[in-house]
Amino acid sequence: MDRGVPVDRFYIEHFLSSHAALIRGATLEVSENRYTKKFGGDRVSKALTLHVKNNADVIGNLVTGEGLSDIHVDCFIMTQTLPFIYESGKALKNAISLLNPGGFLLLTVPGITPISRFDMANWGQYWSFTDRSLRRLIEEIKDAKIVDLRTYGNVKTSMAFLLGAAQHELKPGDFEVFDPAYQLVIGAAVQRVASN
């Protein structure tokens, strides 16, 4: 039964909204371009979608780089994708390589999360993250500079998410407390810097 918009989407959208000015020029988004349209608006000159299998503008593999050699964008929106890629470090490195110098990767990952049955059956689900693990993955990429890395969540929203509650079942104030002990969503804005 679909109860409505999941709790974690509130935080994902809050993060993207706070970095909306970075969603500009040529953009790439995993699976669909919902957030590019919602937060990029007129700043976006070209909106591409990426998928490993089908129904996308770009069919490519973030781990191997296959199908991605001709892609260069100003912004790459990658929400809740890394948990489903076993070699997440390679995928993150290739994601950064798709950016034009000065471009931005807007990345979100789950911290506290249940298993997604659909994704587990189709790709596998391998990871949950913390702010420290995500920071370390990014810092291992020489051309990547973390501009912002923040956590979202608290005990109430984490419990609600695990129980399958929807956003409308919580009060607006429930989302205002960010407790680093309950990292439901971690967001990072990462800039590609020129190589030395």
Each language-model region and where it sits:
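Short, flexible hinge/linker loops that cap or flank conserved catalytic cores
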Residues: A21, G41, S69, P180-Y182
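Class I SAM-dependent methyltransferase Rossmann-like catalytic core
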Residues: M1-A21
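Conserved SAM-binding loop
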Residues: A26-S116, V190
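Short gly/ser/thr-rich secondary-structure transition/capping motifs
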Residues: D8-Y11, D57-N61, K171
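A generic secondary-structure signal
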Residues: F15-H19, G65, N94, L137
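A structural signal for well-ordered alpha-helical segments within the folded catalytic domains
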Residues: F10, H14, I71, D131-R132, ...
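S-adenosyl-L-methionine-dependent methyltransferase catalytic module, highlighting the catalytic core
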Residues: G89-K90, N94-I96, N100-N196
